[in-house]
Each structure stands twice: as C-alpha cells, then as structure tokens.
Amino acid sequence: MLITDKLLLSYQRCNLRAFLDTCGDWKQLDPPSDFLLKLMRDSAAYQQQVLEHETYQQPYYPRGDWEAGAIATLSLMQQGVDRIYRGVLIQGELGQTNDKLTSLVGIDGQYFSDMGEVSQTNIHLSSSTPHSSNITLVSRPHLLIKQPGQSKFGDWSYVTADIWLSKRPKLDYQIIAAFHARILATVQGKIPESAWLMLRKKGFWEVNLDQRNPQMFEILDRCIQMIENLDKPEVFISRQKCNLCGWYTTCHGEAESIKHLSLLPGVTAGRYARLKTLEITDVESLANANSELLADYPEFPDRVAFDVVRQAQSHLLNQPLLREEGRRKKEEGRREEGRHDTDFDTDTRIKDREEGRSENLEELNSSEIVPDIVDNILNDIAVEEVKIRENKPAAPAKPAPILRSKPIPYSQSVFLSVAPIELYFDIEAEPEMNLDYLHGVLVVDRYNKTEKFHGFLAESAAEEGAIWEQFLELMWAYPIAPIFHFCDYEVKTFKRLAKLYHTPAYLWKPVLKRFVDIHKQVTQQAIMPVESYALKPIARWLGFDWRDAKANGAQCVCWYDDWLKTGDRSILEAIVRYNEDDCRATYVVKDWLTNFLLNQKQ
C-alpha cells in the first residue's frame, strides 16, 4: 500500500476523494476546468517567485519512479546540498519488494496516473492500530533545508519547508509538515526539531511538531484503514469543497440518485451526523421531523431546525414555501461572517454570488487545490498556455430572452418595490488584479415595456476609472430607479470604487441607498427546492437559461486573462453576454419573488 503526502492531504479534505484517488475509475474524472488550470499556473508562478531567491538543487528521476527519486535525493543529502527542491523521502526498506503500484501525480492526485516500482515494507506507526498490509510512505516536501546538527550524514541535518500561496497556516498544511518530518527522521537518522511553512506575506512559519504529530498519526491510521479495508466513505456534497474536485460529477450523480440530504441547503456535515444518530437519513423523514425536538441539539441553533425541516418539505413537494415571519425579522440587517446558520447563502468561494466571488481569491488558491502540480510545470521549463475550452462560444449566441411581457403593476406590490424603471446590476472582476472590469446594467422600463442592456467594459486596468464614471452617469440618468443586484459584492465594490477614485459623496451616497439585494430578499422570505441559493440554481429552477450553458464567474476570470494575452474580441463578447444574462436572471428572480409574495398575501 502506498500512502503519499498528496493522498493524506486529500484525505483531510475529503475521505471519499482520497478513496476514489486510490480505488476509483479514473475514466470518470472530470477534465480540469480552465479556472483550475489557471490556479495551477498561478501556483507555479508563485513558487518560481519564491525560488528566485533560493539556490537549490533538484533530484532527477523517471516520473513516478519514487525509488529512483529517493536514491537521487539521498545522494544530494549525503553531499550536504544546502537546498533540495522536491526531494523524495520514503519510509521503508528499499528493495524488499518491487510490486507495481499506481501512484497519483499531477493535479492533487486526480488527473494523471503513473506506474512506478515502489518497494514496500511494514511501517510501524506511533499508534496502537495494527495494519495487515505492507505500507510505504512517500513524502515530497517542497524544500529540504540544511542546518547544523548531527545526523547519519555528518554534522548536518535537514528540515522541511512547504511553499503555500495561502496567508494562513491551515491545519492540513501542518499535518503534512508533520508527515514530512516523520519520514525525514527515518531517512537521516535524526528527528527534525522543526518543520516550516512558507506562506504568502508571512514568510516562514514554524509548525509545532509536538502538537501536530499525534494528530498526524491518528489521521494517517484512519486513512490506511480506509484503503486497507476498501471502506468507501459515504458521499457528501459540500459545495465549497467539491466544486473544483475532479470527482464532482461522479459524487453528485451518486448523491442525486439516492436524494442525499447533503443536497439540501442548510444540511452541513455536522448536522447530517446528528440527523443520522436520530435515524433521519432521507428527505421524507426530515420533512416529517419534529423541528422542536431537533432544536434541542447544538447543531441546530437559532431556529435552524425549523428552516432545515421546511427546506426538506419544499424539496419533497417541489414547490417554494414562505419563510416564517419571525425568522425573517430576526435575520434582517444581520451581517454574516461566512455562511448563514441555515447556510441558505451562496455556497461557493470563487464569487460571493454565482459560483462564489471572493474579494480574497488567495483563500482559494492552487497551492491548496493542486499542491503537487507546480513541480511538474517547473520541470517542463515552459508553462503551456491554457486553451479556451469548449464552453467559450464560437458560434453566434442566441438572442437574449425578452422577459415578463406583462409586468407587475407598480401599485400591487407592498413587499418588494416594483418601479416604472428598474436597474439590474452585475459586476465582473479579476480578483488577482483587484480589477472590476465590467459593470453590466439592464434597464427595465415597465411603462414603455422595453429592456436595454448597458455594458461598461474596461479593456485594460487603466480604463477602470473611466467605466466607473460612465456607470455613475447612467445611475443618475434614472435618479430614483431602484438598483437590484444579487449578493453584496456590488455594494462592497461600489463603495471601494467611490473611495478609490475620490468620488464626491453627493454623487455616490444617494445612489447607494437605492441598492436592493435580491439574494438577501429571497433567503429571508422564501424557501425553495434548490440545492443552493446562488443565482444559477434559483434562476434555472424558474426556467431561465444562460446562453452559454457552461459559463460562470470563474470562467470569466480565465476569459479576461486570455483577452489580455490574445486581444481576441470574441472573448470580451462572451464575457459581456454572460454578464447580461446574470442581470436578466436577477430580473427573473426578482419578478418571481414579487409575484410569490403577492400570491401569499392574497
């Protein structure tokens, strides 16, 4: 049995992913998205940036031949090389056996397979758990750093350091550092006194091995038992963690086939564990559950139990339900850190809205997702440019749909404003450049029954200020029109740009008061039979289709980067088309919610 640092990292994030990486059918893997490939390149570039200031040597060996890699690394260590990049450390007696093993390399052990001869031997872990199989542990720290101290090599020894794009020393990084240190101890005959993470902006960060070693051994034991016993973990869909995984389609299909509770918004892993102890394991049993009894458990605080039960009822009936009045009032004005207690919020991290849009993209970086691909890119010397995938439209797009031929009379709605003229606003951004390059506005004139889309596009970063001014001019062309948007990114960006470009308060503060967050309105007033309260699932449930079916916010990040490199204007057209559809989808959701609330009142 082969256990690599990559596999252990996957196991910490998702047990099922580690199982499928080892035992799954690789033909079922999703191809990596353009966004994931972009993250890989970004991670490679960051490692190159760090290594520019280091003098290092690297072991060379046939790809996937860990034994050859370990021998080459050992030779460099015996020579006393100061820095060794991507050395191979193996815990086991080389040459005892030479069974063919499949090693997972590439995109965090997802997309490529190599066959390498890896020797195996029984590994005696620092735990009481017996293992029947022969086990080989393979570690590939980003750097082995020489330091004073006796070892089998002489009066020097080594410590490990991993380069992460993240700003935070996350626990899974620290566990991997402890794994490196454990195997390094057997190679050099001395237990390392420390292990290091090299973090963006923070630099070197020391891992407390005394604290992390016991945790590492416990995690390692569980991982070995899972693979040894072929004990496939239960599927669980967690949108934040699953979206970029190569097994997403496989796992989601399995979850759909059994109507798994993790597909319900609000059913987190902790809550699902509690529900299982109560023998509530399907949608019907949750829909019939007593929410007052659920509320006695700490996993269901602050009326969450009621909302989760109602969510199951909505799915069972396949119809929307009115959220309880008291719950809506309690949530009004509450600023959330992360996700709502009910998790009826955008479930991703690429944007705060559809597919997640984060102001801090570094929290979703390629070092976390693909910790091993960067060395493959560095070894190839030249980074191959990412090709635009098939979801970039080549043929002319279908015309934008004309929505709502019979608009709701302004006087009928007392729940959500229906104005003679309404503005629907959506932004596209390039987070790494801190650039908001597209302000899309759909102007809906209900009186004249017209709809017109305005796309204020910056073809380079230098034009951001100009499109900001153009956008403001349009807002003041309709001085009392409400401005509808989905999630709070538009509000945050509006404030940021006003400050950045020293906009007088009288030009932007009155406009800010006209913003209405449709996402907030939906999540506070309705419960819908959707998997996520992001824009796409809601609008699609209502029958709206994007003209570019596979386009999303992450793809737009890739498209804009490709535009800057190629100057291909068809790329800009695809971005603007997607942005317009986002505005129109927001329009659909807003009109539906107004009608829904009106019907509930009647």
Report each predicted region and the residues it spans.
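Metal-dependent nuclease catalytic cores that hydrolyze phosphodiester bonds in DNA/RNA
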Residues: 1-114, 123-153
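Conserved DEDDh/DEDDy metal-dependent 3′-5′ exonuclease domain
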Residues: 80, 84-95, 138-142, 147-149, ...
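Acidic, Mg2+-coordinating catalytic module of metal-dependent nucleases/exonucleases
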Residues: 198-201, 207-252, 258, 538, ...
